[in-house]
Amino acid sequence: MGCIKSKENKSPAIKYTPENLTEPVSPSASHYGVEHATVAPTSSTKGASVNFNSLSMTPFGGSSGVTPFGGASSSFSVVSSSYPTGLTGGVTIFVALYDYEARTTEDLSFKKGERFQIINNTEGDWWEARSIATGKSGYIPSNYVVPADSIQAEEWYFGKMGRKDAERLLLNPGNQRGIFLVRESETTKGAYSLSIRDWDEVRGDNVKHYKIRKLDNGGYYITTRAQFDTLQKLVKHYTEHADGLCHKLTTVCPTVKPQTQGLAKDAWEIPRESLRLEVKLGQGCFGEVWMGTWNGTTKVAIKTLKPGTMMPEAFLQEAQIMKKLRHDKLVPLYAVVSEEPIYIVTEFMSKGSLLDFLKEGDGKYLKLPQLVDMAAQIADGMAYIERMNYIHRDLRAANILVGENLICKIADFGLARLIEDNEYTARQGAKFPIKWTAPEAALYGRFTIKSDVWSFGILQTELVTKGRVPYPGMVNREVLEQVERGYRMPCPQGCPESLHELMNLCWKKDPDERPTFEYIQSFLEDYFTATEPQYQPGENL
């Protein structure tokens, strides 16, 4: 969400295959200090989707009822704890997966491996717990602990993680051949997948996936000739012998401490005085973005909005919805200052906006595989927004944030419809992002998930051109007129034709003919691996 100033019919063909696909390029040191991105295991939300737009009085509908393309859905993170609520008497013992430093006087500091009795877990993301080691009680983030006697407590178990996210994690710089993790199978209920980092002369660093199947009697196997009573015994066996796998299991893949769900218990509408603005990161037509600290303890990003940008009551209503949208490719909304000037407090992402990263940061040096992977991450987040019947309305590189190891997260989802500035609400004013907006949205205000798909096609051109302004040499009015007449941007230099064909699908005149984000995600995630089997049979298996 920010100021825009103008400067200047086929299905996808066979996908581009590079001669050598190497591991992702590692970004250099943080621009604003070391910070991590959330790539820890997440759990699936159960139950039917909620139409968030109907709750927030959006004048136009959410996702289109027509889904012209298929594609595999991906995992997404919990909206609330997946554990049973109402535990009494501390019967279930939980163990910490990560260290945690208390942020308030009501919080409980703890170390990885510390055990707890849960006193009260009925209040969502923050549980009241008692440390068995110290006897102290306080609130702990519920996504930092798991039942002590469960498979989730194993360091190598990463839960509901998609194949692509497993590959991103295992291929992080510094990881060696044989590093591994176990996750839930995406394709077979009750089964698991073993993902291992490998190397060969043809592909270089790569990841192999093996399906772990479950026997009727409860045992587990990759090959029927080697069966085990428990997953733990299976993992132990393959750490001692490769036994047909591409490599013996060496060390567990390092995980990254996840973001907590919110800053602390009951820290939603917070006092302005609890925030310290420290480093100005950017400025737009509607406000500024700062790196700062909450409560003297927690690094955050703070978006400050100019008075009059939006009605505080409408913002607070929308923010209540936005904070329920949780996915590891969406920037989490932590807290708000709801009186003008409005402050929006979110996770701090160390590399800043994707636009700045491509134009001025290490993104200038990225090659096509890394750029396609970033597009796939954005499509992953948008596919979640699609499933939740929500709309972004302002999808472009300036509203994507980048963290360590090229992790991308979508920011500012849903805020655009609240802006009250006349130069924006006119839809053709100087501040409106015409070049990213679908014609039916720019001309008639028909914003849907399909207009977001159009914007994603424009965002793809930003990626492959390293941040070039779309429609170079054309002003806003000219763009609107030409697009209405059927003009579409030509294939950017160095962009494979199959990627340009995907862009053209996103730019179909009829919104219902545009692909779903689910399809786009599937297309991009498999862009370089479409000819390979998803699971390896292994040698002599």
Curated annotation (Swiss-Prot):
Enzyme Commission number(s) from the entry: 2.7.10.2
Underlying gene: Yes1
Organism encoding this protein: Mus musculus
EC class: transferase
Name the UniProt record assigns to this protein: Tyrosine-protein kinase Yes
Keyword Cytoplasm applies: yes
Protein task: Non-receptor protein tyrosine kinase that is involved in the regulation of cell growth and survival, apoptosis, cell-cell adhesion, cytoskeleton remodeling, and differentiation. Stimulation by receptor tyrosine kinases (RTKs) including EGFR, PDGFR, CSF1R and FGFR leads to recruitment of YES1 to the phosphorylated receptor, and activation and phosphorylation of downstream substrates. Upon EGFR activation, promotes the phosphorylation of PARD3 to favor epithelial tight junction assembly.
Residues reported to bind ATP: 281-289, 303
Swiss-Prot/TrEMBL catalytic activity: L-tyrosyl-[protein] + ATP = O-phospho-L-tyrosyl-[protein] + ADP + H(+)
Lipidation (N-myristoyl glycine): 2
Organism classification: Eukaryota, Metazoa, Chordata, Craniata, Vertebrata
Post-translational modification: Phosphorylated. Phosphorylation by CSK on the C-terminal tail maintains the enzyme in an inactive state. Autophosphorylation at Tyr-424 maintains enzyme activity by blocking CSK-mediated inhibition. Palmitoylation at Cys-3 promotes membrane localization.
Active site residues per record: 394 (proton acceptor)
Similarity comment: Belongs to the protein kinase superfamily. Tyr protein kinase family. SRC subfamily.
